[in-house]
Amino acid sequence: YGKGILLDGVAAELIAICRDAGKPVVVDPKGRDYARYAGATAITPNRKELGEAAGRAVFSDDEIVAAARELIVAHGFAFVVATRSEKGMSVIDLVDARHIATQAREVFDVSGAGDTAIASFALSLAAGADRVAAALIANAAGGVVVGKRGTARLTVEELTGALFRSHHAAA
Protein backbone atom coordinates (compact mmCIF):
# COMPACT_ATOMS: atom_id res chain seq x y z
CA TYR A 1 0.00 0.00 0.00
CA GLY A 2 1.27 3.48 -0.82
CA LYS A 3 4.22 2.18 -2.83
CA GLY A 4 2.97 2.96 -6.31
CA ILE A 5 3.26 0.49 -9.16
CA LEU A 6 4.15 2.71 -12.09
CA LEU A 7 7.83 3.15 -12.84
CA ASP A 8 9.22 6.38 -14.25
CA GLY A 9 7.63 7.26 -17.55
CA VAL A 10 4.88 4.64 -17.40
CA ALA A 11 2.34 6.98 -15.78
CA ALA A 12 3.10 9.70 -18.33
CA GLU A 13 2.63 7.26 -21.20
CA LEU A 14 -0.67 5.95 -19.81
CA ILE A 15 -1.94 9.50 -19.24
CA ALA A 16 -1.03 10.44 -22.82
CA ILE A 17 -2.76 7.35 -24.27
CA CYS A 18 -5.95 8.02 -22.30
CA ARG A 19 -6.00 11.71 -23.15
CA ASP A 20 -5.49 10.94 -26.85
CA ALA A 21 -8.48 8.58 -26.61
CA GLY A 22 -10.58 11.30 -24.96
CA LYS A 23 -10.80 9.44 -21.65
CA PRO A 24 -10.59 11.15 -18.26
CA VAL A 25 -7.59 10.25 -16.13
CA VAL A 26 -8.12 10.33 -12.37
CA VAL A 27 -5.05 9.73 -10.21
CA ASP A 28 -4.87 8.87 -6.53
CA PRO A 29 -1.40 10.36 -6.07
CA LYS A 30 1.38 8.92 -3.95
CA GLY A 31 4.51 10.72 -2.85
CA ARG A 32 5.28 14.40 -3.14
CA ASP A 33 6.29 14.57 -6.80
CA TYR A 34 3.09 15.17 -8.72
CA ALA A 35 5.04 15.98 -11.90
CA ARG A 36 4.82 12.26 -12.77
CA TYR A 37 1.04 12.77 -13.14
CA ALA A 38 1.27 15.87 -15.34
CA GLY A 39 -1.62 16.17 -17.76
CA ALA A 40 -4.00 13.95 -15.79
CA THR A 41 -7.58 15.18 -15.72
CA ALA A 42 -7.70 15.17 -11.94
CA ILE A 43 -5.77 14.16 -8.87
CA THR A 44 -7.47 13.10 -5.65
CA PRO A 45 -5.15 13.72 -2.70
CA ASN A 46 -6.40 13.80 0.85
CA ARG A 47 -5.84 17.01 2.80
CA LYS A 48 -2.52 15.83 4.25
CA GLU A 49 -1.19 14.66 0.86
CA LEU A 50 -2.23 17.96 -0.73
CA GLY A 51 -0.27 19.87 1.89
CA GLU A 52 2.79 17.66 1.44
CA ALA A 53 2.74 18.20 -2.33
CA ALA A 54 2.36 21.96 -1.83
CA GLY A 55 5.16 22.03 0.74
CA ARG A 56 3.05 23.29 3.65
CA ALA A 57 0.23 22.17 5.89
CA VAL A 58 -3.25 23.08 4.66
CA PHE A 59 -6.31 23.20 6.88
CA SER A 60 -8.76 25.94 5.92
CA ASP A 61 -10.87 26.04 2.77
CA ASP A 62 -8.75 28.92 1.45
CA GLU A 63 -5.49 27.05 2.09
CA ILE A 64 -6.80 23.94 0.36
CA VAL A 65 -7.98 25.96 -2.66
CA ALA A 66 -4.65 27.80 -2.93
CA ALA A 67 -2.60 24.59 -2.73
CA ALA A 68 -4.82 22.83 -5.28
CA ARG A 69 -4.55 25.72 -7.72
CA GLU A 70 -0.76 25.75 -7.42
CA LEU A 71 -0.70 22.08 -8.41
CA ILE A 72 -3.13 22.65 -11.29
CA VAL A 73 -0.90 25.38 -12.71
CA ALA A 74 2.32 23.46 -12.12
CA HIS A 75 1.18 20.15 -13.61
CA GLY A 76 -1.68 20.86 -16.02
CA PHE A 77 -4.47 19.11 -14.14
CA ALA A 78 -7.99 20.18 -15.07
CA PHE A 79 -9.00 20.06 -11.42
CA VAL A 80 -8.23 18.65 -7.98
CA VAL A 81 -10.59 16.68 -5.76
CA ALA A 82 -9.28 17.01 -2.22
CA THR A 83 -10.77 14.46 0.17
CA ARG A 84 -11.18 15.87 3.66
CA SER A 85 -12.35 13.01 5.91
CA GLU A 86 -15.29 14.14 8.03
CA LYS A 87 -15.39 17.49 6.20
CA GLY A 88 -16.25 15.85 2.88
CA MET A 89 -14.37 16.87 -0.24
CA SER A 90 -13.49 19.91 -2.29
CA VAL A 91 -13.58 20.09 -6.10
CA ILE A 92 -11.26 22.85 -7.27
CA ASP A 93 -10.27 24.24 -10.65
CA LEU A 94 -8.70 27.57 -11.57
CA VAL A 95 -12.05 29.39 -11.52
CA ASP A 96 -14.32 27.62 -9.07
CA ALA A 97 -14.14 25.72 -5.80
CA ARG A 98 -16.98 23.62 -4.40
CA HIS A 99 -16.84 22.24 -0.88
CA ILE A 100 -19.13 19.25 -0.43
CA ALA A 101 -19.98 18.37 3.16
CA THR A 102 -20.52 14.85 4.41
CA GLN A 103 -23.87 13.72 5.72
CA ALA A 104 -23.80 13.09 9.47
CA ARG A 105 -23.64 9.38 10.29
CA GLU A 106 -22.09 7.03 12.79
CA VAL A 107 -18.58 5.99 11.78
CA PHE A 108 -17.55 2.39 12.43
CA ASP A 109 -14.45 2.02 10.27
CA VAL A 110 -12.76 4.32 7.76
CA SER A 111 -10.88 1.45 6.06
CA GLY A 112 -11.40 1.71 2.33
CA ALA A 113 -13.59 4.82 2.46
CA GLY A 114 -11.13 6.93 0.48
CA ASP A 115 -10.64 4.21 -2.12
CA THR A 116 -14.41 3.79 -2.42
CA ALA A 117 -14.88 7.53 -2.86
CA ILE A 118 -12.14 7.82 -5.48
CA ALA A 119 -13.35 4.78 -7.44
CA SER A 120 -16.92 6.10 -7.36
CA PHE A 121 -15.73 9.51 -8.50
CA ALA A 122 -13.75 8.08 -11.43
CA LEU A 123 -16.60 5.79 -12.49
CA SER A 124 -19.13 8.64 -12.33
CA LEU A 125 -16.86 10.93 -14.34
CA ALA A 126 -16.23 8.22 -16.95
CA ALA A 127 -19.99 7.64 -17.19
CA GLY A 128 -20.52 11.29 -18.09
CA ALA A 129 -21.25 13.00 -14.77
CA ASP A 130 -19.81 16.47 -14.32
CA ARG A 131 -17.15 16.85 -11.64
CA VAL A 132 -19.50 18.19 -8.96
CA ALA A 133 -22.10 15.46 -9.52
CA ALA A 134 -19.30 12.88 -9.48
CA ALA A 135 -18.06 14.31 -6.18
CA LEU A 136 -21.56 14.18 -4.68
CA ILE A 137 -21.82 10.51 -5.67
CA ALA A 138 -18.32 9.78 -4.34
CA ASN A 139 -19.05 11.53 -1.06
CA ALA A 140 -22.23 9.49 -0.59
CA ALA A 141 -20.37 6.26 -1.44
CA GLY A 142 -17.62 6.95 1.08
CA GLY A 143 -20.24 7.84 3.66
CA VAL A 144 -21.91 4.46 3.30
CA VAL A 145 -18.75 2.39 3.76
CA VAL A 146 -17.60 4.23 6.91
CA GLY A 147 -20.85 3.02 8.48
CA LYS A 148 -19.73 -0.60 8.06
CA ARG A 149 -17.12 -2.62 9.92
CA GLY A 150 -13.89 -3.50 8.11
CA THR A 151 -13.35 -3.07 4.41
CA ALA A 152 -16.78 -3.26 2.88
CA ARG A 153 -18.43 -3.34 -0.50
CA LEU A 154 -21.01 -0.81 -1.58
CA THR A 155 -24.25 -1.91 -3.20
CA VAL A 156 -26.24 0.06 -5.75
CA GLU A 157 -29.17 0.11 -3.33
CA GLU A 158 -27.04 1.56 -0.53
CA LEU A 159 -25.63 4.26 -2.80
CA THR A 160 -29.06 5.11 -4.20
CA GLY A 161 -30.46 5.38 -0.67
CA ALA A 162 -27.61 7.62 0.47
CA LEU A 163 -28.05 9.92 -2.53
CA PHE A 164 -31.80 10.06 -1.95
CA ARG A 165 -31.29 10.96 1.73
CA SER A 166 -28.66 13.60 0.95
CA HIS A 167 -30.86 15.16 -1.72
CA HIS A 168 -33.83 15.38 0.63
CA ALA A 169 -31.66 16.72 3.47
CA ALA A 170 -30.48 19.54 1.18
CA ALA A 171 -34.00 20.39 -0.03
Q: Language model features by range: what are they?
A:
Residues Y1-H99, Q103-E106, A127-A129, I137-A140, ...:
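Ribokinase/PfkB-type carbohydrate-kinase core domain
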Residues A113, V145-V146, G150:
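Hydrophobic transmembrane alpha-helical segments of multi-pass transport and channel proteins
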Residues V110-R131, A135:
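Short, small-residue alpha-helix embedded
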Residues M89-V91, A119-A122, V144:
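N-terminal cofactor/phosphate-binding cores enriched in small/glycine residues
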